[in-house]
Structure formats: structure tokens, C-alpha cells
């Protein structure tokens, strides 16, 4: 299903991660509909093969097959994974999958990607877990391969697919963010983001990218009310706030309050 991007974007955007666990797919599909109707800007899932919380053997669905369905179901929101594990797919294949979902959605895919961390996924699906260092090195090698594949594809992506990289390692991960990302998803509180944002900009200067203006800062705000932290987020330069919710109920009450706060910013 094609969609048309809005002519302008709000100062801060709101994303929700619908964790594909402990729910039937009908419940997930309904949550996507409700989230888009609420006015969120981005709907994410995640890229795991088992639940991360609750019953470790509970119901769960795969990331990219789901994104293809969301691309058809939705009309306005951007969609993506928060985040895809680089280890699970050859970079060229991942580029092709992303390009395909980009076309299905009419140019609304964000490629969220990270180095990977959840060992059970690796062990049960036959991937080599390695070490944090080897997984980060693999991510660094994958990013130019993904972009090179996009440049070679026929048809090309409908747009320059935005790349979101998740992680906060100050020496290696933030260097990869500086080199390749359009969005950086940080973990932790506002002060952590502010400090690491400065480090990111140092990496940006080293590689010749103005990351202060070219890389949107994203931060999770689970359990936090906009009236409590919203002003600090704006002061820190956050451009995307994300919230997460799990099945089977997919409670969007806090998400709705953040959408109202976003709209009040003008």
C-alpha cells in the first residue's frame, strides 16, 4: 500500500515499538491500526526469534515478514525494526529485503540495524555468536555493502532509505553511527544521550560529517510522562522518542499522551 509523506515533520516525532511477543498476529495487526490512528510517526517491531520478557517460549513472530505485511496495511506511518540484527542476514540480502519493503510501503521504511546481542537467537538459529567486538566489526563491514547494493538495484529504492543505528559504544559503535547513520538510537537517560551525543559529533568531525545536523537523536522513554521529561528531551536535541508495548494487550495509553505532547509543541 503506497503512502504519501507529510509535507513537513514535527519538531519531535513519536515512535512505538510493538513487540511481537505473547500475542496472536490478529492482535498485532489491530495494534498497528490503533497506533496509526493515534497519530504516531513510526511503528517499529524488533528482530528476535523468541520473547525477551515473560514466558521465554511464548508466542512470537518474525520481524521482516511482518514488516512486509505492515507496509501493505498502513498508509501514513513509517515502519521499521528497532532494530534489525546485522548477524541474521547477509548484507546484500538485507539490502534487498529493505528495498522491497520500501517499495511496498511507498517509501516509508526506516532500516534500523544493530550489532546483535541476544544469544538464544544465535544459538537456536545457527548463527555464530562471537564476541561484542566481532559483531560490531561485522556491522561496520555490512553498512557500505548495504548501500552499495542499494545503488546497484533495479529498481532502485524509492528514496534514500533512512538508516537508524542502535547502540552507544563510544569508541566503535558511535564511529559507525557517525559514518553511516541518519538516526542514532541511544539507550539510557537524557544525560547519557547528551554526553554521548557530544562524542558522536567528535566522531563526525573526524570522518567529515556534520552529525549534529545530519543525524537525528532517538531515545526510548518507556514509563516516563511527557510532562516530566519532555522539556529535557527538547533541550538535548532529541528528534524521535520511542515507547514500547507488548502483547497481548498492546496498551497505547502512554503513547497517546506523548502524541498529544508532540502536537502541543507546534
Label the predicted regions:
Residues 1-266:
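Active-site-adjacent structural elements that line small-molecule/cofactor binding pockets in enzymes
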Amino acid at each position: 500500500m503506497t503512502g504519501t509523506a507529510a509535507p513537513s515533520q514535527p519538531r519531535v516525532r513519536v515512535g512505538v515499538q510493538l513487540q511481537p511477543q505473547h500475542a496472536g498476529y490478529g492482535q498485532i495487526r489491530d495494534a498497528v491500526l490503533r497506533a496509526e490512528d493515534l497519530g504516531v510517526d513510526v511503528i517499529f517491531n524488533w528482530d528476535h526469534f523468541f520473547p525477551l520478557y515473560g514466558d521465554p517460549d511464548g508466542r512470537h513472530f518474525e520481524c521482516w515478514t511482518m514488516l512486509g505485511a505492515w507496509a501493505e496495511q498502513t498508509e501514513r506511518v513509517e515502519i521499521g525494526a528497532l532494530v534489525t540484527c546485522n548477524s541474521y542476514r547477509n548484507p546484500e540480502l538485507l539490502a534487498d529485503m529493505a528495498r522491497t519493503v520500501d517499495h511496498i510501503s511507498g517509501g516509508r521504511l526506516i532500516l534500523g540495524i544493530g550489532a546483535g546481542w541476544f544469544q538464544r537467537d544465535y544459538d537456536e538459529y545457527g548463527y555464530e555468536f562471537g564476541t561484542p567486538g566481532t559483531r560490531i566489526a561485522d556491522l561496520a563491514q555490512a553498512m557500505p555493502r548495504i548501500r552499495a547494493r542499494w545503488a546497484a538495484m533495479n529498481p532502485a529504492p524509492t528514496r534514500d532509505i533512512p538508516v537508524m543505528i542502535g547502540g552507544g559504544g563510544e569508541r566503535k559503535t558511535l564511529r559507525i553511527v557517525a559514518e553511516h547513520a541518519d538516526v542514532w538510537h541511544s539507550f539510557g537517560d537524557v544525560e547519557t544521550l547528551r554526553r554521548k551525543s557530544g562524542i558522536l559529533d567528535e566522531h563526525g568531525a573526524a570522518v567529515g560529517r556534520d552529525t549534529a545536523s545530519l543525524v537525528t537523536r532517538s531515545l526510548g522513554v518507556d514509563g516516563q510522562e511527557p510532562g516530566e521529561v519532555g522539556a529535557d528531551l527538547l533541550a538535548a536535541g532529541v528528534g524521535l522518542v520511542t515507547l514500547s508495548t507488548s502483547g497481548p494487550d498492546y496498551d497505547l495509553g502512554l503513547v497517546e499522551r506523548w502524541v498529544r505532547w508532540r502536537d502541543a509543541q507546534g
